[in-house]
C-alpha cells in the first residue's frame, strides 16, 4: 500500500482545497491519504465523512503544535484517528485559531505599511476554508500583486524568516508539548512525532521515545529530508 500520511489543504496552510487532494493522490498511484491540517478538526472531519474518495482511503488526522520550552523549539505531532468530540482537542484548536489570527493580522498591518498596494482583506480571502489566516495566505495575496513569484521565496524569508528573524514575523504562544501530548491521548489518537530534525527536536524525541509517550516517528517527509541534507541537527 502506497500512501501519504502528512498532507495539508486549504483547511490550514495548504494551497489545494481538501476535496481535490484524493484525486491528486489517485493520479500518483496512492491508495491512502491522511488529511492532517494544522491545529484543526476540519480535515479529520472530512476524512471521517468521506472514508474513501476517488479510490483513495482517507485517514482522519490533525497536526498539533506544541512547544519545547526547555530547548526553545516548536514541535509538531501528527495525530491519527482522533475523537473529534474530545473537549481538550476542541479547546486546543480554538485557542490556536485565535492566537494565529491575532498574529497574522498584526503581520498584515505591518505589511500594509511596507507595501501600500497590499490590503489585509486580500489575504483573508485565503482563510475562507480554514477560518485562520496563515502566512501562506498572506504570501499568495502578495504574489497576486506581483510582489513575489511564489510562497516560500526570498520575500517570505524577509518577512517571516526565523534566522534572521523576519521583519513582520509574529508567532503565537504554543502550549507545552507535553500538554499537547496529553490532549492527543485524551482524543484517543495515534501520535507520531513529525519531522523531528526540522525544528532540531532530536533530544526531545529521544526523551519521549524512552518514556513511551509517542507511537511513531515520521522518518520521511520533504521538509525532514531537506533538514537532513543541510544537517540542521
Please state what every model-predicted region is.
Residues 22-42, 57-63:
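Divalent metal-dependent hydrolysis catalytic cores, especially in the metallo-beta-lactamase
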Residues 52-207:
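Extended substrate/RNA-proximal surfaces in nucleic-acid metabolism proteins
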Residues 14-24, 199-207:
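Short, acidic/polar
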Residues 42-51:
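Metal-dependent catalytic neighborhoods of phosphoester/phosphodiester hydrolases
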Residues 223-230:
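Conserved small/polar residues in nucleotide/adenosyl-binding loops
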Residues 2-12, 194-196:
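Histidine-centered catalytic micro-motifs
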Residues 211-216:
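Glycine-enriched alpha-helix->loop->beta-strand junction motifs that scaffold or abut catalytic
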Amino acid at each position: 500500500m502506497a500512501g501519504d500520511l502528512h498532507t495539508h489543504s486549504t483547511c490550514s496552510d495548504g494551497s489545494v482545497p481538501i476535496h481535490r487532494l484524493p484525486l491528486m493522490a489517485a493520479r500518483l498511484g496512492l491508495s491512502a491519504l491522511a488529511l492532517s491540517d494544522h491545529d484543526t478538526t476540519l480535515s479529520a472531519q472530512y476524512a471521517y465523512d468521506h472514508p474513501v474518495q476517488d479510490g483513495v482511503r482517507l485517514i482522519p488526522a490533525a497536526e498539533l503544535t506544541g512547544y519545547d520550552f526547555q530547548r526553545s523549539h516548536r514541535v509538531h505531532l501528527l495525530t491519527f484517528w482522533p475523537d473529534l468530540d474530545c473537549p481538550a482537542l476542541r479547546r486546543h484548536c480554538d485557542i490556536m485559531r485565535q492566537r494565529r489570527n491575532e498574529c497574522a493580522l498584526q503581520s498584515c498591518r505591518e505589511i500594509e505599511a511596507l507595501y501600500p498596494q497590499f490590503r489585509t482583506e486580500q489575504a483573508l480571502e485565503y482563510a475562507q476554508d480554514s477560518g485562520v489566516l496563515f502566512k501562506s495566505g498572506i504570501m499568495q495575496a502578495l504574489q497576486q500583486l506581483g510582489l513575489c513569484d511564489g510562497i516560500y521565496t526570498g520575500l517570505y524569508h524577509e518577512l517571516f524568516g526565523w534566522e534572521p528573524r523576519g521583519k513582520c514575523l509574529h508567532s503565537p504562544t504554543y502550549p507545552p508539548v507535553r500538554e499537547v501530548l496529553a490532549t492527543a491521548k485524551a482524543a484517543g489518537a495515534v501520535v507520531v512525532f513529525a519531522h523531528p530534525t526540522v525544528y532540531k527536536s532530536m533530544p526531545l524525541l529521544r526523551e519521549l521515545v524512552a518514556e513511551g509517550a509517542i507511537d511513531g516517528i515520521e522518518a520521511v517527509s520533504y521538509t525532514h529530508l531537506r533538514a537532513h541534507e543541510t544537517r540542521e541537527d
